[in-house]
Amino acid sequence: MRSHYNTDLGISHVGQSVKLCGWVNSYRDHGGVIFIDLRDRSGIIQLVCDPNDSKEAHEIASNARNEFVLIAEGTIRPRGEGLINPKLKTGEIEVVVSKLTIENESAVPPFAIADESVNEELRLKYRFLDLRNPKLYENFALRSKACIAARNSLANMGFLEVETPILTKATPEGARDYLVPSRVHQGEFYALPQSPQLFKQLLMCSGFDRYFQIAKCFRDEDLRADRQPEFTQIDIEMSFCEQKDVINVAETFLKDIFKACGKEIQTPFRQMQYKDAMENYGSDKPDLRFNLKFIDVIDIFAKSNNEIFANIAKDTKKNRIKAIRVPKGDTIFSKRQMQRFEEFVRKFGAQGLAFIQVKEDGLKGPLCKFFSEEDLNELSKRCELEVGDVVFFGAGAKKTVLDYMGRFRIFLANELKLIDPNALEFLWVVDFPMFEQNDDGSYSAMHHPFTMPKNIDETDLEEISSIAYDVVLNGVELGGGSIRIHKNDIQQKVFKLLNIDEEQQKEKFGFLLDALSFGAPPHGGIAIGLDRLIMLVTGANNIREVIAFPKTQRAQCLMTDAPSPASNEAMRELGIKLRENIK
C-alpha cells in the first residue's frame, strides 16, 4: 500500500512520487494551505495540502484531525529557506499532496502522542496509543534486533532452540509461583515457570548438549522499576563445560547483540570475586563507571579511644568500619549537603555518618580527638588524603554497613555527576557463597539449590562457596548462572543442608533426582534478562518502556483490567470456591 516509510525519505528523493500511510500527528491551517505532520512507526514527515495543487486533497485534509488514519500520495520537494526543521529526520523535505484518503477516523485522543508529561497510568491505560510514539517503537525495533542477533550467535555456536513447558510443577526457586488451577484434575494446580531451570538441565541429561531459548518467565514478587511479574530471558545451558566455557559463550553472544544494536563492547569482561565486590563496593553488582572504592580502616579505629568505635573494631568477623574518600569534597559540599548525606544513610540503618575534612593545617572534625597523631597520619596515608578532601566513615554490623555504604557510594556519584551515561562497564562477579542466612536464622541457596558447591564437606554453611557467576552492566545485574550439580548424591546432600527431607525431595524434585541417576553429564548455563538488557541499551527510564504491554508496580494491566474476577461458571468448572476474610 505504501511506497516508503516516512524516514526512508530525504533530500535525495526530491522530485520523486511517493505514497505514504500513517496517522495525523498535528494539523495546521495557514491561510488556506493545510500542513499535516504525518506519523508512522519510523517518524514524522510534513504533508502540504494546497488547493492550487489539488483542490480535492485540500478539501479532504480540512476534515482531518489528530490520530485520523491517512493515505497520502504526492511529490517530494525541499523545504523553503528558513523552514528546515532540524528536529526531524525528514526536516529538509515535505510532500506536496496530490491525493489524500481518510482511511479511518479517531475519537479525541486522551493525550498527545508526543507529550512526555502524560501520567504513566494514563499512558498504560491507552497503551495502544502510547505505542504509536516513534521513540517507543525504536525501543522495540532494537529489541527485535537483539533477539535476532542472539538467535544467530547461539545457533552459530551449535546451540539448539528448544521450547520448555509453561504449565509445570511448583518448585521452590526463591519467589512465589503463579498457580493455574486444573479443570481436569480438580483441586490440583500447575505453576507458571519462574525459569526453565530444571527442564534445561533435563535436556542436558537427554544429551542435547547445547540448548537455548528466549523464554517467558513468571514470578509473583514485589515489583521495582526494573522488575515485572512476567519477563523474558535469554536462557542457555551446555554440557561438558566449565565456568570459563559458559562465560566465553555469554560474552560472545552479548558482543553480537550489542553490535546489532550499534554498540561495540570489549571482551573479555573484568572478573571480581563476590567477597571483594561486597568489601570494596558494598554490592554484589558494583557500578564500575566511577571509583569511590571503600577503604578498610577497622584496624586503625581499633586503636582509637572512642569506646563505640573501639568495641565495633574488636569483632572483625561480624563488624566493619569502611571509609569513602571524596577528592576535594570539602571544597564542594555545603553544610546542608553533609546533613542530607547523614539523613540518607540513616534510612538504611546507619546510626550516623562520621567524617573528617582535610584542611591546610591538617585533619579536622569531631573524630580527630579520639586518635593519636600517629594514628591520624596512618589514616591519612591509608586513605591517600590531600588538602580539600573529605572522608566519610561507616561503622557497625557487617551486613548493615556494607549495604548503606554501598548505597551511599551511588548517592555520592550521582551528587558529584561522576557517572558517564554512555559508558558500558561489564563485570563478572564470581565465587558466590552457596548459602545465605535468612532473618530467622535459617539458610537458603544464594542462587538456587542446583548450583554446584566447591567445598560441600565444609561444616560451616557460610564458608561453602559455589561455582556461580553473575554478569553485571553499569551496576545492574544482567543475568546469572552456575555450573550445576550433576551427581545425585551431591544434590541430595544440598537438599538436606536446606532442610528439605527425603519425602519433600521425592515429591518436588523426584524427576530431577531420577535424571541425575542415569548418567547426567557435567553441565552449566546462564540466563540473561532481555528486558533489563534492552532497558540499558536504549537508556529507558524503566523496564516498562521496553515491554509492549507491561504491568504496573501493583502487577496490574490497566488496559485490559487484569487481573479480574472469574465468572461463577468458570469457578464451578474448576471446582473452586473463594473464602472470605482469609488472613
UniProtKB/Swiss-Prot annotation:
Annotated localization: Cytoplasm
Listed EC numbers: 6.1.1.23
Catalytic reactions of this protein: tRNA(Asx) + L-aspartate + ATP = L-aspartyl-tRNA(Asx) + AMP + diphosphate
The protein's enzyme class: ligase
Keyword terms of this UniProt record: Aminoacyl-tRNA synthetase, ATP-binding, Cytoplasm, Ligase, Nucleotide-binding, Protein biosynthesis
InterPro entries: Aa-tRNA-synt_II, aa-tRNA-synth_II, aa-tRNA-synth_II/BPL/LPL, Asp-tRNA-ligase_1, Asp-tRNA-ligase_1_N, Asp/Asn-tRNA-synth_IIb, AspRS_core, GAD-like_sf
Highest rank taxon of the organism: Bacteria
Binding site for ATP: 219-221, 228, 477, 529-532
GO cellular component, one term: cytoplasm
Biological processes per GO annotation: aspartyl-tRNA aminoacylation
Role description: Aspartyl-tRNA synthetase with relaxed tRNA specificity since it is able to aspartylate not only its cognate tRNA(Asp) but also tRNA(Asn). Reaction proceeds in two steps: L-aspartate is first activated by ATP to form Asp-AMP and then transferred to the acceptor end of tRNA(Asp/Asn).
UniProt family annotation: Belongs to the class-II aminoacyl-tRNA synthetase family. Type 1 subfamily.
Name of the protein described by the UniProt record: Aspartate--tRNA(Asp/Asn) ligase
The gene coding this protein: aspS
